Amino acid sequence: MKILGIDPGSRITGYGIVTKEGNRLIHVDNGAIFTDSAKDFPSRLKRIYGSLSEIIETYRPDAVAVENIFFSNNVQSALKLGQARGAAIVAGVNAGLDVFEYTALQVKQAVVGNGKAAKQQVQQMIKVLLNLPEIAQEDASDALAVAICHAHSVTIKRLTSASVQEIKSKRYK
């Protein structure tokens, strides 16, 4: 399964692509989409959408995982972040992909095993899990973490579903 993780932002949107083969996680690519703050906001959203659409077309992921907004003290920033998330989600949906959302707490829990882990701990664990030569750019690293979170979530859902089916089959025999 190939997963595109996205860390949306109105100035910088990180992306990370991870393949899960059995129990192995394999790094495919990562990077950041930078928008020009001198341009109007709709043009910046168009850049995010267009760049992610190109990435989806190039790498053909099976699923998209996006970091969810937790909170923001600045209403204007939260609205812009929400719109950037919307552009990312639409890029995935428009390509016919399922889009999954995870909170920062869920991502940290999946990657480090501690929902309150420091950013440096998460970055270091990503480097180890994906056998990267160095820590990825901050936004790209966050996106890789979201992709890893989804990879782990799919495994857990599969195991849970199999266990439920096994219990049901025994109960009705």
Curated annotation (Swiss-Prot):
Subcellular location: Cytoplasm
Active site feature: D7, E67, D139
Cofactor descriptive note: Binds 2 Mg(2+) ion per subunit.
Molecular function via GO: crossover junction DNA endonuclease activity; DNA binding; magnesium ion binding
Named cofactor requirement(s): Mg(2+)
Pfam families: RuvC
Any single GO BP term: DNA recombination
EC number: 3.1.21.10
Residue sites binding Mg(2+) 1 per the record: D7, D139
GO cellular component: cytoplasm; Holliday junction resolvase complex
Top-level enzyme category: hydrolase
Catalytic reactions on record: Endonucleolytic cleavage at a junction such as a reciprocal single-stranded crossover between two homologous DNA duplexes (Holliday junction)
UniProt keyword list: Cytoplasm, DNA damage, DNA recombination, DNA repair, DNA-binding, Endonuclease, Hydrolase, Magnesium, Metal-binding, Nuclease
Gene3D superfamilies, A to Z: Ribonuclease H-like superfamily/Ribonuclease H
HAMAP family recorded: RuvC
Assembly and binders: Homodimer which binds Holliday junction (HJ) DNA. The HJ becomes 2-fold symmetrical on binding to RuvC with unstacked arms; it has a different conformation from HJ DNA in complex with RuvA. In the full resolvosome a probable DNA-RuvA(4)-RuvB(12)-RuvC(2) complex forms which resolves the HJ.
Function: The RuvA-RuvB-RuvC complex processes Holliday junction (HJ) DNA during genetic recombination and DNA repair. Endonuclease that resolves HJ intermediates. Cleaves cruciform DNA by making single-stranded nicks across the HJ at symmetrical positions within the homologous arms, yielding a 5'-phosphate and a 3'-hydroxyl group; requires a central core of homology in the junction. The consensus cleavage sequence is 5'-(A/T)TT(C/G)-3'. Cleavage occurs on the 3'-side of the TT dinucleotide at the point of strand exchange.
The protein's name: Crossover junction endodeoxyribonuclease RuvC
Organism: Geotalea daltonii (strain DSM 22248 / JCM 15807 / FRC-32) (Geobacter daltonii)
Gene field: ruvC
